[in-house]
């Protein structure tokens, strides 16, 4: 069973999740840059019929790509280990499972927002976000202490 958060529990995780998402986005950008260099080498070789390329530079690009992919994977896994769900890395969209009136819903946060101010049903997604109001505050709950 997935962890369910209270609003305050999820809010406390925001600084850590923010940092990890930014690190993941940096790694993704580095991966894409290295992949472009590799693609350029590949296209150059194909166009020139196997002409020699700067082997050291090509190997360095592959190494950078692989290191960035590893960092990206590690950062995403670290975010997921907190119990929240990465819905869209590119915009930094994260959901935190919770219960509202006994039904599982998600607290919704996006990179750049100062805190969690929205929630939505599990099938509604970002477009179905609703502002957290007093009714939600009065009737949502995380996991019960064991």
Region annotations inferred by a language model:
Residues 5-8, 12, 19, 53, ...:
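Short, flexible coil/linker segments at or flanking structured domains
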Residues 36-37, 43, 57, 105-106, ...:
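Alpha-helix boundary/capping detector
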Residues 49-61:
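A short, surface-exposed helix-loop junction/capping segment
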Residues 33, 37-40, 44-47, 54, ...:
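Heptad-repeat coiled-coil alpha-helices
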Residues 1-44:
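Long, hydrophobic N-terminal alpha-helical segment
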Residues 66, 73-146:
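Glycine-rich, aromatic-bearing surface loops/beta-hairpins
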Residues 17-34, 61, 65-68, 72-75, ...:
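Amphipathic alpha-helical coiled-coil segments
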């Amino acid at each position: 069973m997935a962890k369910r958060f209270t609003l305050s529990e999820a809010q406390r995780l925001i600084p850590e999740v923010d940092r990890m998402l930014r690190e993941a986005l940096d790694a993704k950008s580095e991966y894409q840059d290295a992949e472009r260099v590799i693609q350029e080498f590949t296209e150059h070789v194909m166009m020139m019929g196997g002409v020699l390329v700067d082997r050291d530079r090509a190997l360095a690009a592959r190494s950078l790509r692989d290191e960035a992919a590893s960092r990206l994977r590690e950062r995403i896994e670290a975010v997921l280990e907190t119990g929240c769900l990465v819905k869209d890395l590119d915009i930094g969209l994260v959901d935190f499972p919770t219960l509202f009136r006994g039904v599982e819903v998600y607290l919704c946060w996006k990179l750049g927002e100062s805190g969690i101010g929205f929630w939505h049903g599990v099938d509604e997604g970002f477009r179905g976000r609703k502002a957290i109001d007093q009714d939600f505050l009065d009737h949502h709950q995380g996991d019960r202490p064991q």
